[in-house]
Amino acid sequence: MKPSERRKARRLAVQAIYSWQLSGNNIADVEHEFLTEQKIDGIDVTYFRELLSGTATKQAQIDELITPHIERPYDEVSPIEKAVLRLATYELTFRKDVPYKVAINEAIELAKAFGAEDGHKFVNGILDKIVGRK
């Protein structure tokens, strides 16, 4: 099965969020860099842009939703897991058209693809708590 355009947009967005977190560059510059330097065929570019800019502009709000569910200092969370959590929390909170099960499953897949060995379990646990399933 081919990945959907939105799945590809999420994958690119989490990489861009990761880059933004580490570089501290302006989010518009990061967006431009990713859209000009990455292969974007088959990607929902509009959704990519929304995920990236929305996550960046709502970062403080998103982090306030995440941090109560983490049992260690937030700055000790790996940057890739933080990027996945921020992206998924943005979708869960601000994209009501995306079913929470889809947002969580996509986040788990992103954590498996980019995160540490058991990073997907950590991401799943936090997101379940955010949506109130635990």
Swiss-Prot record:
| Keywords, sorted A to Z | RNA-binding, Transcription, Transcription antitermination, Transcription regulation
Q: Would you kindly state one Gene Ontology biological process term found in this protein's UniProt entry?
A: DNA-templated transcription termination
Classification via CDD domains = Terminator_NusB
Any one Gene Ontology MF annotation carried by this entry is: RNA binding
Q: Which GO terms describe its cellular component?
A: cytosol
Decide whether keyword Transcription regulation is in the record: yes
SUPFAM superfamilies membership: NusB-like
Q: Does the keyword RNA-binding apply?
A: yes
Give the similarity note.
Belongs to the NusB family.
- Role of this protein: Involved in transcription antitermination. Required for transcription of ribosomal RNA (rRNA) genes. Binds specifically to the boxA antiterminator sequence of the ribosomal RNA (rrn) operons.
Protein's UniProt name: Transcription antitermination protein NusB
- Originating species: Shewanella woodyi (strain ATCC 51908 / MS32)
Gene behind this chain?
nusB
